[in-house]
Amino acid sequence: DVESRGLGDVYKRQDIGRVNVTMGFPLRQSLAYTFVERLVELQNHRRKKGGGWTFYHADVAGILAHPYVAECDAVLTRTMHEEIVRDRRISVDAAWLGRNELLKRIFSPAAEWRELSDYMLGVIAAVARQPYEGDDAKQRVEFLAVIAEQVTKLRNSLDECDIELAPEVYISLLRRHLQTLRIPFEGEPLEGIQIMGILETRNVDFENVILLSCLLYTSPSPRDS
């Protein structure tokens, strides 16, 4: 269905013109959420080394391969990843990783929970400013904006409580909150292919309806019954 397959399959279809989504899309299944997860894992496995910091090679590879980063400079990120693999590096120095402003911001340490909050907001803002092209550029910025808004709300709520949290607790709260969110779509104008939740179909009258999935006994009754 749309939730499990994501909007990517829709965008890949060259024969589809206008697509109108009227159902909310789970944030946890978006590229924006996977990017946040990779940032979290990157910080979880950071290590202090001398006067600097290192990051675990698998986390670094995940960041460099993520579309939000790779599309900024495909040649640079691919070259960096190939060098890490060739040299069989386990830990990668932050100083070596900071090849441009975006990478410097991403590969910087964030220890306590307030630093993590500021780090997330800074990286999200930097990524959103990148000159992306393609059909999903607007969607990308909108998803990142939703995450930034929720990170800010969580920060404000915790500040009001005036409590100290371990970074692990903050990360758990952030994850649980983001995983429950759905991106609302306006559902207008009514043209092209309509992608809808099953309950939304009760009051519509289309010539062709394709039912992708539905649990037994949950199909809504016809409008005339």
PLM features: what roles do these ranges have?
Residues 4-5, 9-219, 225:
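Polyanion-engaging groove/track-forming segments
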